[in-house]
């Protein structure tokens, strides 16, 4: 049964079964299974410049400091700043995001899992993006980030599976 969460969240519905909330109104996740190893998938997710190939909110990134990058939103044309906190041991990345460098704060996270750990064939990886809704985020802005992350999953998979991710054997780092 679908139920509207609140007037503030009128575009987002919760799926309930026996009065248990199934869809989280505060966090959105998008995942996709890719035919590449987890290490390669993680390298793409953890490389701030190469993310400019798939991150629609921060396209065509350039590095401005050790872990800080700036790109351009395909939606507004305005700059989007991103700072990465990379944890290679856990194949995890936290992303601070803002319109200005001084405004950077935690917004998104990525995890990469070896597909075989979840029963998928060897040589596969599960890539997941998470985002959390800000207290003052409009319905439109929330809908945009959620649907954007879902679209980005297909870009990530296409880049990794085609070898156009900027990894080994793909020296062209220019986003197309």
Would you name each region that the model predicts?
Residues 7-33, 113-122, 146-151, 162-176:
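Hydrophobic-ligand-binding modules of eukaryotic lipid transfer/binding families
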Residues 9-65:
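Hydrophobic ligand-binding cavity/cleft-lining segments
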Residues 31-35, 83-85, 111:
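Generic structural detector for well-ordered beta-strands
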Residues 50-107, 120, 151, 162-163:
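Glycine-rich portal/gate segments that line the openings of hydrophobic small-molecule binding cavities
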Residues 98-162, 167-169:
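Beta-strand/loop substructures that line and gate deep hydrophobic ligand-binding cavities in soluble
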